[in-house]
Amino acid sequence: MLNKVSWIKRPQGQDAQADRSLTEKVSAIIERVKTEGDTALRAFSQQFDKVVPAQFEVSEQEIAEALEGMDAQTRRDSEFAINQVRRFAQAQLATMQPLEVETLPGVHLGHRIIPVQTVGCYVPGGRYPILSAPVMSIVPATVAGCEQIIACLPPGAHPAMIAVCHLAGAHRIFKVGGAQAIAAMAWGTESIPSVDKIVGPGNAFVNEAKRQVFGRVGIDALAGPSEIFTIADDSADPRILAADMLAQAEHDIHTRAGLATTSRDIAERTLAEVERQLASLPTAATAGEAWRRQGEIVLCEDEAQLIAFADHMATEHLQVHTRDPHATAAKIRNYGSLFIGQNASVVFSDKCCGTNHTLPTMAAARYTGGLWVGAYVKICTHQWIDEQGIPAIAEPAIRQSRTEGMQGHRRAAEIRLRPQDIDAITTGMRD
């Protein structure tokens, strides 16, 4: 079905000359932080950020000054976003319940929902002070009940970012960025405690560092550049389509923004509209380059092909602009987050509507969803078996163990079934 689509505008593709030494560079950073601790952090801070904080941890005085310096409306808007994310996370957590079930008489199985004890939230710097970034990683951790939540952000970050980290609920905040921050949270230093899980997006160095420390700690995901795709029919408004694509394109020159539509007229008008809006967009240097490199417009034959294309793309943000967007959306299965109808702009989720904006990219939506409160808890099973249940479980376990040749397993099962023969069983007299 996908071989029948046609392109009004094709993407150029990502730069094939990626830094092939990135893995080695990040590995060296991690190893140095592991062995040298804060000394390495100071060296990397000087090298990459051109500033070395007097202390890495943000003091109570610095937090107070950041809050004091925050514009009143900006604070209200940040608190609004925090409350929205908290409400949705609380509602999501409420869908996860402890379980206790008796599957056979005397055989009791269950699970508990246990918060991850310590979480490290990486807060990116980048070209903009994205005040919603700490909200998305910190607030769900507070809702989940994590005992210690730390945040790391580059030392040159805007003071408002520190203020929002505090408002969102971080227990401790550190002025350390990049791969060195990931290493510090994974292994611990004199100043920064090690954590159980690291969440939050970052640049290529941060992403690679998260990949390398996975296993030592848990991670949420490996995030690539931002993505937006809209599927649309002839009822869509090209002005809105263009505006939403450019809103994402201003993130980064590697952003992927696209449209798939059943209408050639909509496709061509949207292409023209992008150029018209770029002419007056203050961030056109970034957005225009992203559009030139990665922008695409695809013409599909019908809605079935639109849906197939959307599932194939498995994009981070998927907008649905059709006559019956809810009916269309119900047929789609691969997306990071779904934006149903033209009123549901990706921008609203990016900033404040309440769904988490940390989402799978690079087609990872085929097998995972985005960051949510469930990422901060463990669903851990348990079992207990009373006397009534022992025969039902022990007898097949004994037979299976014997078939597999696992005599230690067989013995451990059999002593439950025949406790009066425990000495004979454990000394091999019953083998």
Predicted segments with their positions:
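Short acidic-hydrophobic, aromatic-tinged amphipathic segments that line or gate anion-handling sites
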Residues: 1-8, 172-177, 297-302
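A conserved active-site cap/scaffold subdomain adjacent to cofactor or substrate pockets
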Residues: 221-293, 297
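Conserved NAD(P)+-binding/catalytic subdomain of aldehyde/semialdehyde dehydrogenases
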Residues: 169-256
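Conserved small-residue-rich beta-alpha loop and adjacent elements
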Residues: 102-164
